[in-house]
Amino acid sequence: MEFNIYEVRPPRAAWVIAILLVHPALLPSQTPCPPPAAAALEGGWRAYRSDSVSQALRQFRLANRLCPDNLDTGVGLGFALLRSDQVGPADSVFLSLLARNATNSDAWEGRARTALRLGDSAAAIDAGRRAVTLAPGNAELRQLLDRLSPEWDRPVAPAPRRPTSLQLVSRTRGQRFEIVTASGWKPFYPQGVNLGVALPGRYPSEFPTDSARYAGWLDTLAAMNANTVRVYTILPPAFYRALRGWNTTHPERAIWLLHGVWTELPPGHDFEHPAWKDAFQVEMRRVVDLVHGAATIPPATGHAAGRFDADVSPWTLGYIIGREWEPFAVKAFDAGKPRGTYRGRFLTLSAGPAMDLWMARQCDFMLSYEAATYNALRPIAYTNWPTLDPLTHPTEATTVEESRWRRRSGRGSESKKVEYENDVIGLDPNLIQPTTANPAGWFASYHAYPYYPDFMMHDPGYAKAHSSEGQSSYFGYLGELVQHHKAIPVLIAEYGVPSSRGTAHLHPQGWSHGGHDERAMAAVDARLTRDIREAGAAGAVLFAWMDEWFKKNWIVIDYEIPLDNTRLWHNLMDAEQNYGIMGMYAGDERTTPKLGGDIRRWRRLPSVQRARDSCTSGPRHIQMGWDESFYYIGVELPPSRFPWDSLGIQLAIDTYLPRVGQHRLPRSGVRSEIGFEFLIDLVRPDSARVFVTPEYNRHDSRIDPRTGDDFGRFSRRPVVTRNRDDGRFDSLFVITNRARFGRDGSFFPAGRYDRGRLVHGTEAASTTADWYLDDREGMLQLRIPWDLLNVTDPSTRTLLFDQRTNGDFGTAAAGEFHAGVVIYRKGKKPAVEAALPELRQGAWAASGFVGWRWSGWTEPRYHSRLKPVFDSLKALWAAPPSRAPTRLAPRAPSN
């Protein structure tokens, strides 16, 4: 049931009676109250229970004044004050009562509730625990404690004793990992998954707390033949209990843990900022403690908390600390600090830049803490990515270099780019060496995807590289990276492609950042996995376990407004939301319409337009619906094969200000009193697109046809709807790959794609299908991602409507949608065959349209299932990993 943790309920006399029956010696010595005080006390509780709080407060004050030594009058006064939002005075009353008698469960409950209101969760848990110890039947308080700290009633585990000998369960040897087994050390190739845990509707810090859920996930990963799971940050105690439970019951199929230590960027890019660095090191100690089942973390916003009593150290492969540091932060830190050396107990750096030196210190700090506290060591690395790799990339000019080449070539300057500099500075794990006191070793960890940065695709040496399966620029990059780190393992700690409809970055071999249906995603992920093995990497950890709706990427982030609400809806145009092995899909699985699926689901959609003649040869019915991903349109047509060779279908959609927009349709020439922002033109199954009025097109996707230069274009502002009567609609192209210069002046043209291209087919055939015409049932079915219609947040019914030229994009509240359907005859002189609403003298009257609106939501509906990538990697991971020799084409010489 739902329970408000701030609700103040009256104490129950039954709790006190139960305690006194068991412990009569606890009965406090109470001064009998005179009749006026007793009457006031009784009247106070009567008013309290009838929600007359102000009357109750007056009665309790009177009773307490007349009988100040009686605990019951104080309890009543405290609860009445609390319910009147006088939290501080109420807390003082309860503390005073407990100072007089520490066995009063009602006073402890009151103290728990006031502490919670005052923001002291630890004190609230302590007081609540004391209250239910005295009154075990207090179900409401138990539920409150379950919310605050699910393990509040678990017995405290004894602190682990420090072993006398060094505990070593994993280590690095050359370019590989090894784990200890009953028969000694054996090579270990980590093949696993990054565990993101933010369910739809939840922030990334709102972790599931149910051990059964984590146990189910681990069981699924094990069935996939994964042997490793990586976490970025501290998860709730339930995860570690589930991991220990799985591994103790499946010792031959243990899942090893790679644990991260998360942090944000430091203030002013100062990694030596005292408070920030202290917090980072506190987090390191916490991770070490919880891995050994010896941590208690108090509640804090955005952080897992509780008693971590599950020792998972026997299966913790190593640590990966930090995050993908932004290059501007590393550059600023290096510029402000001198180079230096570091000689720690377990790691050394003979000479290096400030950031490399800092990383060595932090990793050594964590190893030293684990050794001192638990006499244990394990391999450690810091998070790195190609943007900060130690290699040199001739095709990746810096901003200064690119500006120089632009001036020399006469191209002019570009607009401000929305991107980091991807080869301006680097971090080199080779600079750090383990000492003789460190038998666990050291490794390099990279997040490496095939489609970014652009040097992955532009470098001629990478482009010539071939794995055993054929050309692979990704394989070329990995091979050079592994060759650079000849003495240590290279773990690819993130890789993969998403099953999103939208694309954020194009790849010439088709391994793009999005734009894959789920079958294609499975095939690409399997190929990348094989390339990683063959390139000589020490392991591969796929990104990610499940789709996480809160994520966002550069190409859509400005249009997801408010950004805080992305967790409430699923944007299929946002590549970052769709990497999961476990897909998280909008709506109720039992009722959500599916392209080519149960026709009854489409026919249950609300009716918006209906033809007067139900037997017309044209469109008979328009229906609309919605879920957390899509705007659905169903159009009932005669049940017969549609003649695409001679006819086409247009759907005109008004999303905002019905009197404003485009009042004439192209091809058909239909005019309308209603203005439209969008047009869907279905020419034939292999040629269908969404178009937008020019003023409402949010992207400037112009590329010079002669040079391929985009001049840094991306966004168009303002983005509004205006009256037009010229039939013009724009395509929904967006620039995904900006034009670039190499360091030698080589030019790489910009790339773009049409977001509005619609794919025909059933959902069973392709998860990125947009529309399907069921000829047999006579039902045209469309599902349009909200983002394609410039809906910035469907949960609050918010649209893009930007009258600004800079700053944040503007929005407006959605009113009603209106839609009309036209069947037109193709040819040199297109003609209208039929329309709904019906035309009057070749035009639509505003009175002929019926508006449709959807309701917002605060809690999304969703369902989940495994994607095909589960099966493709399950089969791949069942085979023993091979380490084929790296074969690389020589790098093409640079000018």
Annotated model-derived regions:
Residues 153-220:
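N-terminal carbohydrate-binding accessory modules
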Residues 288-318, 323-511:
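Noncatalytic carbohydrate-binding groove/subsite architecture in carbohydrate-active enzymes
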